[in-house]
Amino acid sequence: MKYHIGLIPDGNRRWAKGRGLEPWEGHIKGGEKVELFLEWCSDHEDIGEVTIYLLSEENFRRSAQELGKLYKLYEDELAKLMNKEKIHKDRIRINIISTDAKPIPKNLSRLFDRMRTKTKDYNNKVLNLLIGYTGQSEILDSISSPLNRMKNLLFGLRQTDLKRSLKVKTPCDFIIRTGEESEEREAKSGFLLWQSAYAEYYHINKFFPEVTEEDFNTAWDHFKNTRRRKGL
C-alpha cells in the first residue's frame, strides 16, 4: 500500500525573528528543509504521494518585499527541482496547485506550466505543491463548477461529484505540521480540508528550519504504529 503524506511547514518567519533575521531568511532556510523532506520521502517506497503547503491565499496579504523574496526563492528552487535526475528517473509527476493564482507573477506561472507539462505523463509518484491555495476555496470551486451546478439542479450533488472536481484527488493519510507551540495543537490552516477528513496528524514542536531527518523518522514511526493498531 502506498500512502499520501502532507506537510504543513510552519515557523520560518518566527525562526528568523528569534535570530534577528529578515523573514525571507527563514524561508531560505525552510527551503533547505523542504529539500531534506523530499529526499526523505523518496527513500520510502510506501509513500506514493506528497503534498506540501507552501503558500496560502491568506499569505498574499504579506508585504510586497517578503512576497517578492518568496517568489524568487520558489523560482530558483523549483527550477533546481525540475532539473533533478531523480524526478525523471523515478517518474514523479509534479502538480503546482493554486485556488487563487492571480497574484502570482507571470514568469512564475510560466515555470509552473512547464513543470506540469514536463512531468504530466509520469505516474510512479506524485508531488503536489500548494501555492496560493486554501482548502475552503478548493471545496467552493468544486461545488460551483458548471458541471456540478447542473447536477445539483437536476439530480442533487453527491460526494463523488464533489471529489471528482477537487484539485487534489487522493485522500491524505498522514499530515505532519511543524511549529514551536506552548502546547500541541492540531491546526490544518485550510490544508486539504476534504481530503484529510480521516488523516492521522502529527505535530513536530520545532520551527520548520530546525527539523531533522530523525524528526521525520519519529513521525513516520508514529503513523505506522497507529495504523497497525487500527488494523489498517
Model-derived regions: residue spans:
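Flexible, compositionally biased loop and terminal segments
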Residues: M1-L232
